[in-house]
């Protein structure tokens, strides 16, 4: 048994310790088993753990047996990850408030979890206009065709359109719920829920039996933003929950894109405010894909013969250090393509001769390894 799983689960039951504080505790003690056995003095060294909360923790710990809790929990919730599990999504662990327990249902793709396939969040109002629905269909299908994973919340409206359009294009989609995985909410999305469970993946930080609650959905939105490389707000009135997702995306250093519409349309007011505050505008599928790092495929007759291609004659200001030998060949090639100077994604694709989808995924992996940094305008450089 992975004992750390039991301690993540046990700590998640401690009242007063939320995801932000629990991540700090985990980082301070390295192992939550150590934290579980820590003295009051040791616990008080964690930023945010005051005397009153430390006292509450010490009172609650004897009432919880981590091993027994894990055994009992797995009977009702057999499929879940904690940050102690290698399958836990890497991008989600990066955020300040990673869920201590993440339940899943459906088809797990470890390439998603490891950040090798870029995920794009699509969110919006439950009551979209024809304009919003039409553009959501177009964008979701275009993303699916370029091998992006579409991530949304399975709500009525924009979420449902995004999921279903992605599936129609035979793409991969992930739904993040604000309930337990044994409850379908809203009920009218039952068929879509079942299709995603068969062909995609459904996630929730809430255990089986958790019913819809007003406070669950803003918390759910941080997971959508955390899993996503970028978030697209397709339509949002001023108080839409989609704007909460956009705020989380900004906080997590994710790109935010939004669809413009007339100021006369109330469903556009939130989007127009995002544009005013610096969100990127969605002008077309092609423009969006280029911004995200995937350009439309070249027709077969226009494909260059890459075996005959020669590298461009460009200055070589400094010889980059050799890449680590344990990187796979694609990552080695990408790293050798980059220098300390900022390079656009299109240039990286051209120089490396690697397909755009692989380039985007590879750059994300290199970012996670700390070998590459992303600059504004989808430009990259070696660190």
Predicted segments, located by residue:
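Glycine-biased, small-residue-rich flexible motifs in mid-sequence functional cores and linkers
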Residues: 1-4, 83-383
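Short, small/acidic-rich helices and loops at N termini and domain boundaries
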Residues: 1-87, 345, 369-371, 376-383
